[in-house]
Each structure stands twice: as C-alpha cells, then as structure tokens.
Amino acid sequence: MKAATAVIDRHALRHNLQQIRRLAPQSRLVAVVKANAYGHGLLAAAHTLQDADCYGVARISEALMLRAGGIVKPILLLEGFFDAEDLPVLVANHIETAVHSLEQLVALEAATLSAPINVWMKLDTGMHRLGVRPDQAEAFYQRLSACRNVIQPVNIMSHFSRADEPEVAATQQQLACFDAFAAGKPGKQSIAASGGILRWPQAHRDWVRPGIVLYGVSPFDAPYGRDFGLLPAMTLKSSLIAVREHKAGESVGYGGTWVSERDTRLGVIAIGYGDGYPRSAPSGTPVWLNGREVSIVGRVSMDMISIDLGPESTDKVGDEALMWGAELPVERVAACTGISAYELITNLTSRVAMEYLGE
C-alpha cells in the first residue's frame, strides 16, 4: 500500500504546452513554474516543459534553482527583484526582471553592473497590486529607456485582475489602458496569463504567460481544463487502510459532525490535512474509488479521512483512492470544498511522495 502520492504525468504537461501554442499561435510562451511549479516539482516540470520559450518565477531562489538544475533558457522574475544587492545576481545568471516600483528604478539607475539586464516594465492597468500607474508610466518608461543598466528596448507587461470571471468590462478597460500606453513602443508586450489565453485572444500579444493551464487545470470555476483540451498533470491518490462496519446512529471522526442514517461500511484513507488535503472539506466531498464516486464523511484529520462506502460495497484494504485526477477533476473538488484549484494543487506538503510518469 502507498500513502499520499502525487503522480505527475509528463506527457500531460507537454500536451498542455502544445495546446496553449495552438490557442496562441502567434505568441511566445513564458511557462510559469513558480511555487514549485504549482506543486508539480520545479525542476521536473521545467525540464519537461523545455519547449517553452522562457520560464516565469516569483523569487530569485526559484530562478537560481533552475539555473543550478541545468535550465539555460530565459527566466523572468515576475515580481521583480527585492533589493539592489540582487542585481549582480541577475546579471551573472542572465535573469530577466519585472520592474514595477520607483525603488527598483532608482536601484537600477544607481547600480554599477558588468552588463545590462533585460527588463519588463510592469504597468498597473487595474489590478492595483504591482505596477506603475498610467499617469506616471511615460516618465517611468523614459527613465528606464535612458538607464545604462537596462537592455533596450524596454519590454512592457501587465496583468488582468478579472479575466477568469464572466464580467468583461473590467478586462476590456485594462486592455484599452495597456494599448494606450504600449502602442508604438518597440519592446515586447505581454498581458495575458491563463485566463487571458483562454478567453481573450485579442490580448495574446508577443508573449503569453500560462500558469495553471500548463498543469491541465482551468482558471475558471467552469468550464474545466478538459473542456479546453487540457490534460490533468497531477493525480493525487492514497490507499484504503481500514474498512469498518458502521451502525445507523453512529458518528465518525472529531466532533461527531457526521452521523450515519443507515447501517453502512466506512473506509479510512491514509491522507489528511498533514498532506495538504483541506481540513475544511465538508462531508459529501467526492473521492474516486473502484470506478465510482464515494463521499467523505466527518472531519478531515491530520493523517486520515473517512468515506462512506455503502452497505453493499466490496472495497478492501489496500484499494487505491483518488482524491483528484482524470476521473475526478480537481476543479470539482474545488467547487465542493470552496477552496480554489490553485490552492489545492500548490498546498501539498513535503510528505506527499512524488512520482513521475514518462520521460
């Protein structure tokens, strides 16, 4: 028997990369592998996605892990550098960076570097998280264009705040803001991440930045990734470690929050919130077992969950239980738990075993 295991399908990762190329055929791809490649393993995912044109990460530590692991293609720091001391590290490792603040601009202007850096100026078109405000953008751009430490021309990027929602006015406004500033400027342009790739082809521009879609998961509540021709790259599974007779009126788990209305059989699966499965998953959350869906009952424990197998079940100790994967999309689990698919796949803990299928 195996305890909690995440099986990563390399074929699915490659398929998804090619599917994104089909969706954005005129754009180059920044494969976003931040946060341990959304829980899929940073180096393994990056090497599998070697046909990408560039890799996107959030932290310098992630970029340096890629370089140490043999990745030679361009790497983009999506959050930018944090301190002036980071700049020589970017130069030495040929790392590109977003620049979104006056502090970063001043650091670039003041630095003495052995070579200039490829820079992406981040424009705040409406996310209001990082980026240069539109009324300050032209002056900021001109200073970057005059900076000896910046490879010319300056590239321009932004990020949609609501591309994953049915409401379109906000995204239209952001795109119009981006175009008003970027039109006629010679650098590369990028604004579309996963949601923009799938729903906003007019926003694809020179570069797109696929994140969660690379892993076969939709950025939307619906439709699911499979509806866009994507394949789930992660299967999270574990094993039944107990099968028990359960009487009507008996509860199960901490707090006795679920009480059976009938005589039934309960199974116990070796996975819990200590593995990253959400403790808040309510009774009724589906699990895939022996070709059918069964339901979680009672509270998720640190190391175990209980499921209602049904009174006539023939399931046995050692049977494999699938928490999400091809048969049970992670988007479905997200809908049942109220926790985004982004969180589900990135929250797996270090004790979950990682297995890789394919070369």
From Swiss-Prot:
* One of the record's GO cellular component terms: cytosol
Q: What class of enzyme is it?
A: isomerase
A GO BP entry is: D-alanine biosynthetic process
Q: Which Pfam families match?
A: Ala_racemase_C (PF00842), Ala_racemase_N (PF01168)
**What are the positions of the active site?**
K34 (proton acceptor), Y254 (proton acceptor)
Query: What are the entry keywords?
Result: Isomerase, Pyridoxal phosphate
UniProt-listed Enzyme Commission number(s)? 5.1.1.1
| Biochemical pathway | Amino-acid biosynthesis; D-alanine biosynthesis; D-alanine from L-alanine: step 1/1
Q: Where N6-(pyridoxal phosphate)lysine occurs along the chain?
A: K34
Annotated substrate binding lies at: R129, M302
A molecular function (GO) held by this record is: alanine racemase activity
What reaction is this protein's catalytic activity? L-alanine = D-alanine
InterPro entries associated with the record: Ala_racemase (IPR000821), Ala_racemase/Decarboxylase_C (IPR009006), Ala_racemase_C (IPR011079), Ala_racemase_N (IPR001608), Ala_racemase_pyridoxalP-BS (IPR020622), PLP-binding_barrel (IPR029066)
Q: Which cofactor does it need?
A: pyridoxal 5'-phosphate
- Protein's UniProt keywords contain Cell membrane: no
The protein's job, in short, is: Catalyzes the interconversion of L-alanine and D-alanine. May also act on other amino acids.
Q: What family does the Swiss-Prot or TrEMBL record give for this protein?
A: Belongs to the alanine racemase family.
Q: What is this protein called?
A: Alanine racemase
Q: Which organism is the protein's source?
A: Yersinia pestis
Taxonomic lineage: Bacteria, Pseudomonadati, Pseudomonadota, Gammaproteobacteria, Enterobacterales
